[in-house]
Amino acid sequence: PDVDFRIDHAAGRVVWTIDGEDYTKHYYPPNLQDCEFGADSLVSEMDYAGVDMALLHTNPMLGRSSTYQAECVRRFPDRFRSMAPVDEWRIHDDTDAVIRELEESITKHGLHAIKFNANGYKISDDPWDDGIYRPFWETATSLNVPIFISLSMGPGIKSWEASQSAQDGYLNELKILMRWMERYSDTTTSITHGFPYRAFIDGDSINLPDAVFEPFQNPNLSMEVCFPVRIGDTFDFPYREVFPTIQSMVEHIGADRLLWGTDMPFQNRHCTYRQSRDHIEKYCDFLGQDDLDLIMGGTASRILGLSKD
């Protein structure tokens, strides 16, 4: 049906109409004008929150321009590094072009990592570790930059579902990741956004099965520590309900393979940039200073090859 789907730029939200009544949804925080959050806005937030450097993610909803990403880094070379975007859905039918674009992102524009959304299931149910993806991966892994992978729940399952099928789907995606890492075991790899915590919420706690930690037998795999954007509408600051999960991640993965992230500006729907630091640095009293130093910057610096200075 025609629901007149549209963007309310001034209010920074999407709007649609059903039976004469307008509905809206905020995915960006509601204070963004024209749905924009550029490099200057991020630097301002970083200055206020005491964040010295950021790794810029890419995603279809954020635009797909390596040229723009590179320009942000050029303007603020001491503040930004950037992932390169990949049009994953085009790999099936336009493999050579996607490979060419990726090579250009790294070799011409000088971007620092690769972002891959493992959600090609919108095109085909083929697993993303091999088959039609093999030529792409052969090139991607040869570029000698870290690869950041956003895992899905598998074909036909939404990431926000809290169901056994969602849990099973995610565990199967981890098996695909492990197969991929067997082939590219020397590639520095990181899982973005942490685990799909919503699928494993049980009352006021998160119950992660031991199987989610199996991929980390590969010492080259790390994971983002990113809670507010994923569960900030379920638990309140300082998110004490997730503290046992953070502790378990440190025990099973290691602080030297955990890196703090936020999904700015999306996470500002739930807390401030400073609070996304504070809930770990001020309230996770089970973390020693060495662990905090690694999670809050040391691990990311190592992955990106930054100097300790």
Predicted regions and their residues:
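Mid-to-C-terminal alpha-helical segments outside catalytic/metal-binding sites
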Residues: 2-53, 247-248, 252-259, 267-309
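Conserved strand-to-helix beginnings and helix N-cap segments that scaffold or border functional pockets
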Residues: 66-67, 95-99, 130, 202-205, ...
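Short, electropositive alpha-helical surface patch
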Residues: 69-74, 78, 207-214, 245-251, ...
